[in-house]
Amino acid sequence: MGLRKGLLVAGACAALMGLSAAPASAKDLVIHAGRLIDGTGKPVRTQVSILVHDDRIVSVDAGYTTPSGAEVIDLSGSTVLPGLIDDHVHITQSFHKGDPIHTAMTRTSFDDEIDAVVNARNTLMAGFTSARDVGGDTQVVVALKNAIKGGLIPGPRLWVAGTPLGPTGGHGDAANGLDPELEHPGWT
């Protein structure tokens, strides 16, 4: 396995270690890591056991050790690193092909929610265990955050801003670029 692929796999596993789709439980988990980049700037450590209790890392020990009753994830052939944090995401957005005006006029918050569920899983699998959503439909992002926190769907731990604020015609105005002939009396 190449270094890039190994880091990607390890990042995803580290993400799953920090936040899984299941709610926190008292069960212990141990990860046998072939290589550990701990994020402190120290040299890479080899052949370590990472003990996780209640979704939190409680120790990193030299060698492959397994406490009694712990579930083992064998990453002895992989590189593991801490979960990453993305501090600027729009988790409900997806860039669809086709006419952007048509998309803006026909998409609903339900479409955004479906995209958000897919994007949350993809974000987690890319190694990001925490993300800050800086603008999206408030009901959608709060529901997504709660579903992840409750273990209903996989995704990173989320901090959400809700619907972005801005001046009419400014950044974040969904009506930007629309033909004036498409105006609706209820929009003013």
Predicted regions mapped to residue ranges:
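Bacterial N-terminal signal peptides
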Residues: 9-18
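Histidine-rich, glycine-flanked metal-binding segment
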Residues: 36, 40-81
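Metal-associated gating/positioning segment near the N- to mid-region
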Residues: 79-152, 168
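General beta-strand structural signal in soluble alpha/beta enzymes
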Residues: 73, 132-133, 160
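N-terminal secretory signal peptides that target proteins for export/translocation
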Residues: 1-5
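Metal-coordinating catalytic core of metallo-dependent amide/deamination hydrolases
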Residues: 152-188
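Boundary at the C-terminal end of the N-terminal hydrophobic targeting segment
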Residues: 21-26
